[in-house]
Amino acid sequence: MVASAPASAGTKGVIRQVIGPVLDVEFPAGKLPKIYNALRVETKNTAGQDVALTAEVQQLLGDHRVRAVAMSGTDGLVRGMEIADTGAPISVPVGEATLGRIFNVLGEPVDEQGPVNASATAPIHRDAPNLTELETKPKVFETGIKVIDLLAPYRQGGKVGLFGGAGVGKTVLIQELINNIAKEHGGVSVFGGVGERTREGNDLYEEFKESGVINADDLSKSKVALCYGQMNEPPGARMRVGLSALTMAEHFRDVNKQDVLLFVDNIFRFVQAGSEVSALLGRMPSAVGYQPTLGTDVGALQERVASTVEGSITSIQAVYVPADDLTDPAPATTFAHLDATTVLNRALASKGIYPAVDPLDSTSTMLQPAVVGDEHYRTARLVQSTLQRYKELQDIIAILGLDELSEDDRQTVDRARKVEKFLSQPFFVAEIFTGMPGKYVKLEETIAGFNQILAGELDHLPEAAFYLVGSIEEAKAKAEKIAAETK
């Protein structure tokens, strides 16, 4: 979808070269399209089949030629075909009409639910907000999830890296965050599927419908818009679909003045797509074969994710680390932009501790006394030191048993186990699987609960009372119920 075209639109050019997803196009003298303009081919190939393709201008080569990257497959294109300058960048629909729908990089619906009745469209390329528009005072973004709010709090308008393998609960955590921002913050979410599996994209859509995040009966009551450019798409689509999702999120922030969650899965694929077309665009490869513009490309995307005085975009980005090498230029460049990391741990998931967020590996720049306050900071550090001591003692316990520990260490282990259990929490979006009502826990309740456990006030309660509850009051009530059942 392309915005209303200016007078220069409609200039016809001729395709002179096609190499994979990259086209060289010749235009009449003095009528070259601008960088980032969308070019459109609508014709028939030699077999008589319809060919419809959009490409984005990347370079002006001289001799009245431009080089463009295709947003879909270039099958069927031949030299000499006509291609038209639309006179504007790729534009996508924005606003409430996008909720509950799935779009491709061009803003075209791909969910077979009919056309989108959007009242406005917006170009995917725009500048980051000016410094004068930014909300520079750090503010914690409360998620209602205990382990995140206490140990690795998110910054409103910040960027969070989500690390985790398959099957440890990434999708459920994403769904819960989408649900909580809608209920507690009156906000909406945008999900950008960048270069991941088509099956996962479909599964996510079905799970969103199942959990009520997408209301299939009344799409206007949905809480999320989806924008997909999956693994099977050409690199042009994977390189730009993140910007399409971001543009939809910016409208909710700037026009509707809402708090928005932007999910990008996976930010590494955005970089990978850029590196795929970089050499074809004639650029000299940089370290490990990445594009020389790596820092610029990532920065242009990340700097648009910000908190303004009108609203905020808080971004949660899944980060794939190639060969687990954190020094690889792609993840290393991404880390420079992150305010927090949420690491999901398979060992915790196998114990049944959900969400399986690692309390020791997850980090946040917000966890400092000047931002969160002394009590929150002290409680978080005490929780981490208790869990760290428990981790150190686990080898001794495995070899010699619990009885060989000193009195102090036994007390630490007992409290650490309760803390670990209390870091679990029933989710709203998982109610249909667990049969337990979801819980949103306020930050003050979270801090108070962990303080009571660490102070020894609840040493007399059984461990099981702390598992999959919301606030500490629920743990006490569960303990009474357990005691009554065992009498």
From Swiss-Prot:
Enzyme class: translocase
Assigned keywords, A-Z: ATP synthesis, ATP-binding, CF(1), Hydrogen ion transport, Ion transport, Membrane, Nucleotide-binding, Thylakoid, Translocase, Transport
Enzyme Commission numbers on file: 7.1.2.2
MF (Gene Ontology): ATP binding; ATP hydrolysis activity; proton-transporting ATP synthase activity, rotational mechanism
Protein name: ATP synthase subunit beta
Catalytic activity: ATP + H2O + 4 H(+)(in) = ADP + phosphate + 5 H(+)(out)
Function: Produces ATP from ADP in the presence of a proton gradient across the membrane. The catalytic sites are hosted primarily by the beta subunits.
Bilayer topology annotation: Peripheral membrane protein
Localization (cell): Cellular thylakoid membrane
InterPro entries given in the database record: AAA+_ATPase, ATP-synt_VA_C, ATP_synth_F1_bsu, ATPase_a/bsu_AS, ATPase_alpha/beta_chains, ATPase_F1/V1/A1_a/bsu_N, ATPase_F1/V1/A1_a/bsu_N_sf, ATPase_F1/V1/A1_a/bsu_nucl-bd
Any GO CC annotation of this UniProt entry: proton-transporting ATP synthase complex
Xref: PANTHER family: ATP SYNTHASE, ATP SYNTHASE SUBUNIT BETA, MITOCHONDRIAL
UniProt keyword Translocase present: yes
Binding residues for ATP: G164, G165, A166, G167, V168, G169, K170, T171
HAMAP family, per the entry: ATP_synth_beta_bact (MF_01347)
UniProt KW Ion transport keyword: yes
Annotated source species: Parasynechococcus marenigrum (strain WH8102)
Location (main, coarse): membrane
Top-level taxon in the UniProt lineage: Bacteria
